[in-house]
Regions:
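Short acidic active-site motifs
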Residues: 85, 284-288
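FMN-binding flavodoxin-like domain, especially the glycine-rich phosphate-binding loop
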Residues: 172-214, 218-221, 263-278, 288-386
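Metallo-beta-lactamase
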Residues: 2-5, 100-149, 195-201
């Protein structure tokens, strides 16, 4: 695929994968592993692909080269879904040099038993690779989301090669009816979300560049309305709510807490609120995490279980904390048969999170819903709708 006259897409689509990174469901739309080739007077290949697709990738490269030979392999990110083809490339093109950060070369030793010492070029923030007619300026992007990561900027065509930044779930040969944001958001908060301050740092560097195209390592090449993507990443990485709305995440066993959640959701919607509800035992938890970060208010609803909270709720709260959840209002709903303590446990779990405002009202379901707990639901709906 031609991106510009001299920059081609040579990546692959994976329709066999069910879980990305062993946990994120991509069974419906698959995954793309992107790679690019820059055809200057000299030729640079940007990144490789996952191990199961190396032969296909090398075939795509051969077609794009049209009889020419690559001079460089540029490694922006060493995660195996982008680096598995390095050894095969270096064997096929013995004259080619390999460029990467020092951290990436250390990882190559771990993965391949060598860092190709006679052929390696260590690059860092601000270094430039002149290809003749095109050049790559390297931008240090540590911890977006691994420590060795580099971005690079091609000045002639104004292209940012953004490693895992601006990526999304889904193969590129399937049109996503929900557009870019939904699966990009799930990808960001699942993969990159913990490292917001590092994303902020690289966005500040990118602000000084005239970017017309963004080439990520997953998902589509971005060519239009780039301000939207940059602004969205700024919102996500600064942990600010993207939209006004309320996410309700619940864990219920016999249905009494679920009934309370349904009444609360209806009460909130009757007050004009946008509400998103997730059963943590049955729904995709990554989507629940996504919406918890998307909206400005969150309701955690859990039964009391062995004096603690239900395991799915514990995992959910732990995942939020692990991804630096902050700057939100959180309300609590608890249930139990004789001595509900879930709200107390959840409150303690939230204490380590930054800038969390607990709602003054809470809902306690003792056994099943009654007039008292329904009144608490109405009071909480009023508070969350102010």
């Amino acid at each position: 695929m031609e991106i510009t006259k001299d920059i081609r897409y040579i990546g692959v689509d994976d329709h066999d994968i069910d879980l990305f990174e062993g946990q994120y469901d991509v069974s419906e739309n698959g995954m793309a592993y992107n790679s690019y080739v820059i055809l200057g007077d000299k030729i640079a290949v940007a990144d490789s692909v996952d191990a199961g697709f190396v032969d296909e990738w090398l075939g795509n490269l051969e077609a794009a080269l049209d009889g020419r030979t690559p001079d460089y392999l540029v490694v922006h990110h060493m995660e195996p879904d982008h680096s598995a083809g390095i050894a095969a490339f270096m064997e096929r093109y013995p004259q080619a040099q390999i460029l990467a950060s020092m951290g990436a070369f250390r990882m190559m030793v771990n993965y391949f038993g060598t860092d190709f010492p006679e052929r390696k070029m260590v690059v860092k923030d601000g270094d430039v690779l002149d290809l003749g007619g095109h050049s790559l300026t390297f931008v240090g992007a540590p911890n977006v989301h691994w420590p060795e990561v580099l971005f690079s900027y091609e000045a002639t065509d104004k292209v940012l090669f953004s490693a895992d930044g601006f990526g999304k779930f889904g193969a590129n040969d399937i049109e996503d009816p929900e557009g870019w944001a939904c699966e990009a958001r799930r990808y960001y908060f699942g993969i990159v979300g913990k490292f917001g301050k590092f994303v902020q740092a690289v966005l500040k560097k990118a602000a000084n560049l005239d970017i017309q195209i963004i080439c990520p390592l997953h998902g589509p090449v971005l060519t239009e309305n780039l301000g939207y993507y940059l602004d969205t990443y700024n919102t996500w990485s600064s942990y600010q709510p993207e939209d006004e709305g309320i996410t309700i995440a619940y864990a219920s066993v016999y249905g009494h807490l679920k009934a309370a959640v349904e009444e609360l959701a209806s009460a909130l919607e009757a007050r004009g609120q946008k509400v998103s509800v997730f059963d943590l035992a049955r729904d995709d938890m990554a989507e629940a995490v996504e919406d918890a970060f998307r909206y400005d208010r969150l309701v955690l609803a859990s039964i009391t279980y062995q004096g603690e909270i239900f395991p799915f709720m514990s995992t959910f709260i732990h995942t939020l904390a692990e991804h630096a959840y902050q700057n939100r209002t959180v309300a609590l709903v608890e249930a139990g048969s004789w001595a509900p303590t879930a709200a107390k446990v959840m409150t303690k779990e939230l204490e380590g999170m930054k800038d969390i405002t607990l709602a003054q009202n809470k809902v306690t379901v003792l056994g099943s819903l009654n007039d008292a707990s329904r009144a608490q639901i109405e009071a909480l709906a009023d508070e969350l709708s102010k």
